[in-house]
Amino acid sequence: MSKKYLVAGATGLIGTTLVNQIPLNEDVTVIARRKINYKRPVNFLNLDECIKLPHADHLFICLGYPLELRDLLLMRKSIKAKFKAVDYNLVIKIAEAAKQSSIKSVSVISSIEAHPKSLNYYLKVKGQMENKIRELGFESVNIFRPSHLLGEREKEITLDVKIFEFFTNIAGNFLFGWFKKYK
């Protein structure tokens, strides 16, 4: 029997990769703001109109507001509300809708070093989101905490990100022990 999956944020780097990795015999519904072409057939729900979710075996939440590199360290005031609206409010709204639809299992993308009491706004919001997801009472909660996301994107990445990625690829070869998780 095939499984049913919901993927929120299916147009980003992780969401697109995830959708294309799910076996073709499985039923996938993507929740996104715009349609894109996948290597497999998908059902489409518009994120802005999504109030009630269809039942599924598992929900993947891969949402994230697009930030500039500098915003990860010290987020500009003009970005904070937009970031929180997506990375906390929208993530929680979708998770709550999933709970109402009797979805028992959820996986969500967070960030390495996320913590609700972090002094870094980005990490603090991610940590608060993780806690709220756990509080919703799903039977299974998977929280993935990647470091910097590398991969082919639809949009051209900026020069500062290219330089950062170049140096982190080199530095990654020298990270070991406790620092290995930052590769």
Where would I find each of the regions flagged by the language model?
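N-terminal Rossmann NAD(P)H-binding glycine-rich loop of SDR-like oxidoreductase domains
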Residues: 2-24
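Structural motif
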Residues: 4, 57-58, 105
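Oxidoreductase cofactor-interface core, primarily capturing Rossmann-like NAD(P)-dependent enzymes
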Residues: 10, 24-26, 116-183
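NAD(P)-binding Rossmann-fold cofactor-contacting core
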Residues: 28-38
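Hydrophobic/aromatic beta-strand patches that form the interior of the parallel beta-sheet core
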Residues: 29-31, 43-45, 60, 107, ...
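NAD(P)H-binding glycine-rich loop region in Rossmannoid oxidoreductase-like domains
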Residues: 37, 42-93, 97-100
